Amino acid sequence: MTPEDLIAHYELEPIPREGGRFRQTWAGPDRGDGRPEGTAIVALLTTEPGDYSALHRLPGDEIWHYHLGDPLRMLLLAPDGSSRVVVLGPDVLAGQHVQYVVPAGTWMGARVLGGGSGGGSGGDGSGGGGGWTLFGCTMAPGFTFEGYEHGDAAELAPLYPDRAVEIGELGRA
């Protein structure tokens, strides 16, 4: 299984500004305020240069789900000035998460860990390794592009000086 196979199978399209590819797989009924009751997407990031989830935040909680491939390293910058790194992946006994809730208003960005064909737990179609991560995100109320706020690395780095290098790596103009 390759990223190209997954792109074709799921009919993934580029995610505007943020990076990666996605397809919305579900949207609930409209709530009357322009937002659906909930949304779900399947998404793909790779280790290709420039392919990462750029820093952004959303007005509601977002649940990230690990599906296949290499672990995904998420940088989270909380409104109170704290920060943390969470790794989505299959090795839950080593502290990885198959599901993680990012609280509303938290800046988030993500990059695939591992790399290249044969990396991780296998490049044999088993879903491990190969320089990519297939994951999903779920929100309720649902995602809208109007609620997406793109992060500015130059503004965020002074607020989280211990994460300045990582912020620079996950910024995108």
Task: Locate the predicted segments by residue.
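Non-catalytic, conserved peripheral segments adjacent to functional cores
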Residues: 1-100, 109-110, 115-118, 128-130, ...
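Extracellular beta-helix/beta-solenoid repeat scaffolds
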Residues: 104-106
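Catalytic Cys-His active-site segments of thiol-dependent hydrolases/isopeptidases
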Residues: 136-138
